[in-house]
């Protein structure tokens, strides 16, 4: 695989920092540009971030002296890269405009932001689930008037535990309805315990917009391409409740599910164990070897013990049992700050690279 020059737009924030750590030794992607707000532009990355480096590993030496570019100077950034990762903290309309500006400058955008997730011709992709949605990109390029530029996005971090668990069961058994309660870590809000003292000894029973995303985005993932748009699926019906809990990293889901054709517990476990997708089949560098891991222990998975399984890119599942109101219930865990954020975007970029969309 050839090497691609990569930029990070929103490089000083928590997700931007995670992108930088993931790209430090990436075999295909070489970090050549860092962009952020005008107040950071012109400073070295080290000075722009200052004491706000939030990763557990030290800031990579290679980026410390890189001069931060102004993210709004699209042509200047685009000239230095083959594509960009975007993780900015702006209003939705501003993010939409910025990402389209990069795409129209013939610079593909792999976005961690939510702004374009429900745009009908923007593929929102989990590589193991709906890699075929990348085939909408020519239609998007036609709308944008670009030859090379496009936008592709990853889905919300709350989905990354329960959607992969449900997906392989849909073909043979037909998921009809699902109730999910998510217990979401503070890193999902860009916080640490030092910057979020209100969460200590507390649970906050509301995360703005999260329940709507958790109910609607899976239907787009399970949708199909019809002409120049992705049409969301109409089933299953999903209802969600999302809570912020005092955990540093790792989103959990408590899932209740009913099927059109109820499988046995053994059939579910076999399906999970055998499931693999294009990320595994193509041996993408960031892909977990085993995507879904099931724990037999009654008290697993746990964020503290299991969030880093397969370098934080796999999904952990446990406590599968029959239910009185639904057919089955189970719990699941994914690492929101890796699989659910920058790691998922890097995996998507690897898929795009293999499929030739950056060429």
Regions found by a protein language model. Name each.
Residues 1-206, 236-237, 309, 315-316, ...:
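N-terminal Rossmann-like NAD(P) cofactor-binding subdomain of oxidoreductases
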Residues 187-359:
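Charged docking surfaces used in two-component/phosphorelay signaling
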């Amino acid at each position: 695989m050839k090497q691609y020059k990569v930029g990070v737009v929103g490089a000083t924030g928590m997700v931007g920092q995670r992108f930088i750590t993931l790209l430090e030794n990436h075999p295909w992607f070489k970090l050549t540009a860092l962009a952020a707000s005008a107040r950071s532009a012109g400073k070295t990355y080290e000075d722009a971030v200052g004491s706000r480096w939030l990763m557990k590993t030290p800031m990579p030496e290679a980026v410390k002296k890189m001069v931060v570019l102004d993210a709004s100077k699209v042509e200047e950034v685009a000239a230095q890269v083959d594509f960009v990762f975007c993780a900015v903290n702006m209003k939705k309309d501003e993010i939409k405009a910025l990402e389209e500006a990069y795409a129209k400058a013939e610079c593909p955008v792999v976005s961690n932001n939510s702004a374009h997730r429900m745009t009908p011709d923007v593929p929102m992709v989990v590589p193991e689930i709906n890699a075929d949605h990348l085939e909408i990109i020519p239609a998007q390029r036609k709308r944008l008037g670009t030859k090379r530029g496009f936008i592709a996005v990853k889905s919300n971090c709350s989905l990354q535990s329960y959607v992969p668990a449900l997906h392989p069961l849909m073909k043979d058994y037909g998921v009809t309805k699902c109730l999910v309660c998510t217990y979401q870590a503070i890193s999902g809000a860009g916080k640490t315990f030092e910057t979020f003292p209100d969460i200590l000894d507390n649970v906050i029973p509301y995360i703005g917009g999260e329940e709507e995303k958790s109910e609607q985005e899976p239907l787009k993932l399970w949708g199909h391409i019809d002409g120049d748009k992705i049409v969301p699926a109409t089933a299953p019906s999903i209802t969600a409740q999302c809570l912020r809990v005092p955990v540093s990293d790792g989103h959990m889901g408590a899932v209740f599910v009913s099927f059109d054709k109820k499988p046995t517990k053994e059939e579910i476990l076999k399906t999970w164990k055998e499931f693999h997708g294009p990320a595994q089949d193509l041996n993408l560098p960031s892909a977990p070897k085993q995507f879904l891991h099931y724990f037999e222990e009654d008290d697993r998975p746990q964020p503290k013990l299991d969030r880093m399984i397969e370098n934080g890119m796999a999904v952990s599942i446990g406590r599968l049992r029959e239910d009185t109101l639904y057919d089955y219930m189970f719990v699941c865990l994914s690492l929101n700050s890796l699989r659910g954020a920058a790691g998922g975007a890097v995996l998507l970029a690897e898929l795009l690279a293999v499929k030739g969309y950056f060429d």
